[in-house]
Amino acid sequence: MPGINGAGPSNFFWQWRTDGEPVTEREHDSSRSASSANSPELPPPASPAESGRQRLLRSSALSRQTREWLEATPARVQGANPPAEARQSPEAQQAERIVQELVRGGADLNNVRTMLRNVMDNNAVAFSRVERDILLQHFPNMPMTGISSDSVLANELRQRLRQTVRQQRALVQSSTPARLADSSSGSSQRSLIGRSTMLMTPGRSSSSSAAASRTSVDRHPQGLDLESARLASAARHNHSANQTNEALRRLTQEGVDMERLRTSLGRYIMSLEPLPPDLRRALESVGINPFIPEELSLVDHPVLNFSAALNRMLASRQTTTNSPELPPLASSAESGRRRLLRSPPLLSGQREWIEQNMRQGAEPQSSRLNRAVRLAVMPPQKENEDNVAYAIRLRRLNPGADVSRVVASFITDPAARQQVVDDIRAALDIAPQFSQLRTISKADAESEELGFRDAADHPDNATSCLFGEELSLSNPDQQVIGLAVNPTDKPQPYSQEVNKALTFMDMKKLAQYLADKPEHPLNRQRLDAKNISKYAFKIVP
């Protein structure tokens, strides 16, 4: 027993003292009493074994050696089991520091977790600049070789990110009533991305009654934490804007033709025309994946936010607006013929032949074959501009022109004209429905729940159309509407619980989109002139 008594205290003090010197029993008693008196932390609950030791210590039938050994035993056991923080591996501690850096940098932890998994699986990734810079400090070879799935640090980081994301979600759910989770998620259109997929899930229905659907817009639902929702929406908007601005900057530095990119993106979004391979590769190189799966609604795709930012950037570069389109520059062959005509020693037959050749070369083939239907104003068709969009533009430049005449002015094959005419008329049939739509006041649309921002009042943070440009009720060329996810009959006003989220857009652009593909851009249900009044709401001052 004396040998056991000497080993117990000696082992304990050699483990915890920093000077490496053993201490006496008196020092042990005094230090133990001082530490217990000065410690600000409460001791942990006693385990059953420790409670048994305390009862044994209170027994008077113990020898001095046995009592000393029992007093040292709990300390030795406690010293052999340090707290969880002390047992953390270096990789776990480094992963914790990485998460803290990401939080301080405003990174989207859920996106980082997903992209980190993609890197380890050799799949495509899209980090923001902040996320990439932080990760490169700890994974310097990530751009060249990726991250091995056997990396201890990467797996620790994924686990820590998963825990943090779950904690954040639990905090949000505890602060927001579950009753309002469905109706509030996705209702504020801060940007064109980040919509909750539960709004697009078939079969989800509201439990509200028919009387609730006939109530006016509730701008302040009870129990909704507006401040938290506003901060979360602003964080999503800033994160998306940072990614988009970084992509635009890199594309500009790489010399990509932004006008051509805007036109190609417009055709891709409006009619799913394939992007040119070089532009598709350029977008993928900056983290923008242009592929739109069939199961994903159009409004959920980040390429829409990029398209809106691209339109804003190019609009700010324009020095003049509504300027008439200039004719194309004369070709070198045409310039040579004109110089030849100015030379005096030409025979009359030669001069007539050159003049006739110039007239034929100056006129497009469509004009030579369709001189009878030549329009007064007919600019050339832009690159990647489809026939429907070009015909609508020609009709706007030539008021009063019949649709068939407009199409015949640039489509030489009579067999190919009818389909274009039908698509244009389908788009034009939707436009008159604007005056028949149910209305939402601008004040209600600008509420925290709906989040509309007129470009005239918010030039730096305006709401963008689903198909690109910024929206304003003062713009005479726009018909601003809010398109709901779920339909309701015409007499009923907008109800957030029944109609779900609103996506703001220009009805003219929507009509052009529906002419080629009559599908609801949010849920892919059929949408045409017959049922658009069940989904759309006109925004009025």
Swiss-Prot record:
GO cellular component: extracellular region
Gene Ontology terms describing biological process: symbiont-mediated perturbation of host programmed cell death
Subcellular location: Secreted
Comp. bias regions, Low complexity: 183-196
Keywords of this entry: Hypersensitive response elicitation, Secreted, Virulence
Main location: secreted
Basic and acidic residues: compositionally biased ranges: 18-31
Keyword Transport applies: no
Family matches, as Pfam families: AvrPtoB-E3_ubiq, AvrPtoB_bdg
Region (Disordered): 1-94, 168-222, 317-338
InterPro entries documented for this protein: E3_ubiquit_lig_AvrPtoB, HopAB_BAK-bd, HopAB_BAK-bd_sf, HopAB_E3_ubiquit_lig_sf, HopAB_PID
Keyword Transmembrane: no
Induction details: Transcriptionally induced by HrpL.
Domain of life: Bacteria
Function recorded in the entry: Effector protein that plays different roles depending on the species and plant cultivars that interact with the pathogen. Acts as a virulence determinant by enhancing the development of disease symptoms and bacterial growth. Acts as an avirulence factor by eliciting hypersensitive response (HR) and plant resistance.
Stated family: Belongs to the HopAB family.
Name the record gives this protein: Effector protein hopAB1
Taxonomic lineage: Bacteria, Pseudomonadati, Pseudomonadota, Gammaproteobacteria, Pseudomonadales
